[in-house]
């Protein structure tokens, strides 16, 4: 696209010529103007126009103003002094000398008009000097600009017609002369290409003023430069016409200089932007092609995948290091080739951004011109897509390599790897290389080490069951003055039965911090010796105070054990056998209750206490053989010990790394969600609902009267006047409780939690109201000898119903519905609340019998169970077959990761 092809039809606008011709010389236009002025009798006005054009160095041809190329830019122009190039930069003395020379020339024009007219017509066509020079210098030459990338269509040709307007004589006289002034409008920032193609010829004084307003809109100021003032002689001239000629000539020079100066600056910016865009396009093509070739060569030459990744990473580093120097080097070349005024470019914000280069880049960069050759659009897109795919693969591989190095570093140093877990978790969530996660199988895996750990914990549960059932057979012989050396009043007897739940409350509160700081195994192990001491205090008691001290110490250990035993078992046993082995503590606890009832038939309270002191001995020995839980080791940052504990529990041939990493991720989530004050965390609205459900289930479990029935079984049967021996009745109740444990384990995952709670409530309500009716008839004097079997039957059904629902389910749902971040503190609160209710029931049961009779106490327990039925219907959710994430989403409205939460099996004897 050449400048000659885009010249347009502006040359024939005023004279009626067709478009597309070359611009006519100024002499032809002046000739036509002379003819019109001569016919109008204004020959003198023509000479004034001609003299002003000569004085202002306008030139002889419009081609000097609009050269061949529509985008003029100086090419290899000699560098001129700023004062010569821009008149407004000259000193006042130089300007005064220049104006004096112009005045002298104007005075000689009247004498040399014929010669000037002839010289004007014969003068050859010359290129216009952009700015007026006092010295003779070679004219500026022009070259075509680089085509802009975004100019794909031929520019629109703008026809600017010459406006020739013949002014009236009055206007001619007022202006002093008629001037032809070439004023191409400066290009605006919005449409630079269109502005460079516009051409116009301004005629007359009115068009001159209009051009001034246009230039003012283009940010060109017509204010006088500092130091420039009209000569005093011209201001004081008496000749008005001469003064007007001088003023208009001076303004013409200034307007022409400012106009071309603005055009030059805009053209320099346009050229720099054009070259920059072309270079960037070539740079991207070169980068993609070089990257694709290099990666293909790597795939062929690499002997292994690791070597390929290493070489590719080195290439990526070299590519990014060379990118900035290459761009900076090329842009410097472009700016040097298109810049003629470094001072003005330094002030421009856009050029400052382009010229900027990092300080640390000092070495030269060699650019291969062959690599900068452009290819077709299809090849360019294909190469870029291939390169982007390879780069994405490289990035993923680097992340995988980094993750592998982090794991290896943790294995060698043995430090706490939890600091790296957030990074690992983020990589996993983003869909990047995932770590192997332990997934339980459906087939049960029985390993003798896990069975040994379950048996050791279950022996501690047997001790707890024996201590819970001790008061039922022991109070019968303890209140007998023939068998006891001290007197035990009914009030003291109630304290013997009720002080253990009160101590269990304190133990439940203290058990939470103990298992966190001492460890699960150490906390359980620490209860063995206090158990033995408590039983010896009871066995050797010489007064009621020693018995109460022994019961309080035993109750404190029971409270700690009831919290720590299920936690240890849940954290050591695999999920595949957790249900089966989790049954052992409940079964051994019921065995302890049955053993206490059977031994109490043949032993007094002192001998029974010596038997209780012997039970913790095997429990103590076995606890020394088992390790601490791996989860507690992970929480303390002891990764190597956690690995050894897993190897002991899972077997030497088992791969424990996936499970160990899962424990570390779960612990990291718990640490991130933990707060400094966990008790305040319980009071949040989102945590109150699950906590209130757990506390409600504990409340209805204990207010059903189960502990009162267990503690006072023999006394109840004696008061009922049953034909069956009281000790035999307690044995029967213990056997039923033991058998109901297996039935509940089978049905709890098949029928559902709420269904078993419904059945349990109905059975307990019916039996409690029937027992209340039996005692009411007996207290009324009615003969009940014919129904002596009724109390035993009601007790059996009552124990069976309790063991099916309200015995195990409150403990089970405590581990299901409590949020992960508050499970420890919330479980401690629930356990303490359970023992508080147990203390209230056992301590006040004897007082309730004295106050409202046995029938009133059983009817009150039945009414509470009936209310608990509606609590279960409207408030307790069903958790059967749901993951912990689904349960928490329903309870709190959000999901958290709970990948390894122990399925805690309750101790049904802890009632």
UniProtKB/Swiss-Prot annotation:
Residues 8-19 have a biased composition (Gly residues). It is a multi-pass membrane protein. Residues 468-494, 549-551, 600-606, 712-727, 776-794, 843-855 are extracellular. GO terms for molecular function: sugar transmembrane transporter activity; trehalose transmembrane transporter activity. Residues 1-256, 334-355, 380-402 are annotated as: Disordered. It comes from the Eukaryota. Keywords: Cell membrane, Glycoprotein, Membrane, Phosphoprotein, Sugar transport, Transmembrane, Transmembrane helix, Transport. GO terms for cellular component: plasma membrane. GO terms for biological process: trehalose transport. Residues 51-64, 76-129, 156-166 have a biased composition (Low complexity). Residues 384-395 have a biased composition (Polar residues). It is found in: Cell membrane. InterPro entries: MFS_dom (IPR020846), MFS_ERD6/Tret1-like (IPR044775), MFS_sugar_transport-like (IPR005828), MFS_trans_sf (IPR036259), MFS_Trehalose_Transporter (IPR050549), Sugar/inositol_transpt (IPR003663), Sugar_transporter_CS (IPR005829). Glycans are attached at residue 482. The modification Phosphoserine is found at residues 302-304, 374, 376, 899-900. Residues 1-446, 516-527, 573-578, 628-690, 749-754, 816-821, 877-911 are cytoplasmic. The chain crosses the membrane at residues 447-467, 495-515, 528-548, 552-572, 579-599, 607-627, 691-711, 728-748, 755-775, 795-815, 822-842, 856-876. NCBIfam families: SP. Belongs to the major facilitator superfamily. Sugar transporter (TC 2.A.1.1) family. Trehalose transporter subfamily. Low-capacity facilitative transporter for trehalose. Does not transport maltose, sucrose or lactose. Mediates the bidirectional transfer of trehalose. Responsible for the transport of trehalose synthesized in the fat body and the incorporation of trehalose into other tissues that require a carbon source, thereby regulating trehalose levels in the hemolymph. This is Facilitated trehalose transporter Tret1. It comes from Drosophila virilis (Fruit fly).
């Amino acid at each position: 696209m050449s400048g000659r092809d885009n010249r347009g039809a502006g040359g024939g606008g005023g004279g009626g010529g067709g478009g597309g011709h070359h611009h006519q010389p100024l002499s032809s236009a002046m000739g036509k103007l002379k003819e019109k002025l001569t016919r109008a009798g204004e020959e003198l006005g023509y000479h004034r126009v001609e003299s002003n054009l000569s004085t202002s160095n306008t030139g002889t041809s419009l081609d000097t103003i609009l050269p061949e190329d529509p985008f003029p830019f100086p090419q290899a122009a000699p560098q001129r002094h700023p004062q010569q190039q821009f008149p407004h930069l000259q000193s006042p003395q130089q300007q005064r000398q220049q104006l004096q020379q112009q005045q002298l020339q104007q005075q000689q024009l009247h004498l040399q008009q014929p010669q000037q007219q002839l010289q004007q017509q014969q003068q050859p066509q010359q290129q216009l000097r952009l700015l007026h020079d006092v010295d003779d210098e070679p004219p500026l030459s022009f070259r075509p600009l680089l085509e802009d990338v975004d100019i794909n269509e031929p520019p629109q040709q703008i026809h600017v017609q010459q406006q020739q307007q013949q002014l009236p004589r009055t206007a001619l006289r007022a202006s002093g002369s008629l001037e032809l002034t070439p004023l191409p409008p400066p290009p605006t920032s919005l449409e630079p290409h269109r502005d460079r193609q516009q051409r116009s010829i301004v005629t007359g004084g009115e068009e001159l003023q209009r051009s001034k307003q246009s230039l003012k809109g283009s940010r060109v100021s017509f204010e006088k430069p500092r130091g420039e003032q009209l000569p005093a002689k011209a201001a004081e001239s008496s000749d008005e016409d001469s003064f007007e000629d001088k003023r208009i000539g001076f303004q013409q020079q200034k307007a022409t200089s400012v106009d071309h100066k603005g055009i030059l600056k805009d053209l320099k910016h346009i050229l720099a932007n054009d070259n920059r865009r072309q270079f960037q396009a070539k740079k991207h093509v070169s980068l993609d092609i070089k990257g694709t070739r290099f990666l293909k060569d790597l795939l062929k030459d690499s002997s292994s995948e690791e070597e390929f990744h290493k070489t590719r990473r080195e290439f990526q580093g070299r590519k990014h290091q060379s990118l900035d120097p290459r761009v900076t080097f090329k842009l410097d070349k472009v700016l040097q080739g298109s810049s003629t005024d470094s001072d003005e470019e330094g002030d421009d914000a856009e050029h400052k951004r382009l010229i900027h280069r990092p300080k640390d880049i000092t070495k030269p960069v060699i650019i291969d011109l062959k690599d900068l050759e452009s290819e077709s659009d299809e090849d360019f897109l294909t190469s870029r897509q291939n390169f982007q795919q390879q780069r994405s693969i490289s990035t993923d591989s680097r992340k995988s390599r980094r993750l592998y190095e982090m794991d290896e570093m943790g294995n060698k140093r043995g430090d706490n790897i939890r600091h790296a877990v957030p990074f690992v978790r983020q990589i996993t969530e983003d869909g990047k290389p995932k770590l192997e996660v332990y997934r339980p199988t459906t087939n049960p895996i029985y390993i003798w080490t896990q069975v040994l750990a379950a048996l050791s914990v279950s022996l501690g549960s047997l001790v707890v069951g024996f201590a819970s059932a001790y008061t039922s057979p022991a109070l019968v012989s303890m209140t007998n003055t023939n068998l006891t050396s001290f007197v035990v009043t009914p009030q003291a007897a109630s304290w013997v039965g009720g002080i253990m739940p009160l101590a269990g409350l304190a133990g439940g509160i203290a058990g939470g911090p103990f298992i966190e700081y001492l460890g699960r195994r150490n906390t359980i192990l620490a209860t063995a010796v206090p158990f033995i001491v408590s039983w010896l205090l009871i066995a050797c008691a010489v007064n009621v105070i020693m018995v109460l001290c022994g019961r309080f110490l035993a109750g404190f250990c029971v409270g700690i054990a009831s919290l720590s035993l299920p936690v240890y078992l849940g954290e050591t046993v695999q999920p595949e056998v957790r249900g089966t082995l989790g049954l052992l503590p409940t079964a051994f606890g019921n065995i302890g209750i049955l053993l206490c009832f059977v031994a109490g038939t043949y032993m007094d309270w002192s001998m029974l206490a010596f038997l209780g002191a012997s039970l913790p001995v095997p429990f103590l020995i076995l606890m020394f053989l088992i390790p601490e839980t791996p989860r507690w080791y992970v929480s303390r940052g002891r990764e190597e010990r956690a690995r050894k504990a897993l190897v002991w529990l899972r077997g030497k041939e088992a791969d424990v790394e996936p499970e160990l990493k899962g424990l570390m991720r779960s612990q990291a989530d718990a640490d991130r969600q933990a707060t400094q004050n966990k008790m305040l965390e319980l009071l949040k609205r989102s945590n109150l609902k699950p906590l209130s459900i757990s506390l409600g289930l504990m409340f209805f479990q204990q207010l059903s009267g189960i502990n009162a029935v267990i503690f006072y079984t023999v006394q109840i049967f004696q008061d009922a006047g049953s034909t069956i021996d009281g000790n035999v009745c307690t044995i029967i109740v213990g056997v039923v409780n033991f058998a109901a444990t297996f039935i509940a384990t089978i049905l709890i995952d098949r029928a559902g939690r709420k269904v078993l709670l419904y059945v349990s409530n109905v059975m307990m309500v019916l039996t409690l109201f029937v027992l209340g009716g039996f005692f009411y008839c007996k207290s009324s004097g009615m003969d009940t000898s014919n129904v002596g079997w009724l109390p035993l039957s009601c007790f059996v059904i009552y124990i069976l119903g309790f063991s099916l629902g309200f015995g195990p389910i409150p403990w089970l749902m405590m581990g299901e519905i409590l949020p992960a971040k508050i499970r420890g503190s919330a479980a401690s609160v629930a356990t303490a609340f359970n023992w508080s209710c147990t203390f209230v029931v056992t301590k006040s049961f004897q007082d309730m019998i004295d106050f409202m009779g046995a029938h009133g106490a059983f009817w009150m327990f039945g009414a509470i169970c009936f209310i608990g039925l509606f609590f279960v219907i409207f408030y307790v959710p069903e958790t059967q077959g749901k993951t912990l994430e689904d349960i928490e989403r329903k309870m709190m409205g959000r999901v958290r990761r709970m990948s390894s939460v122990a399925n805690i099996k309750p101790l049904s004897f802890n009632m």
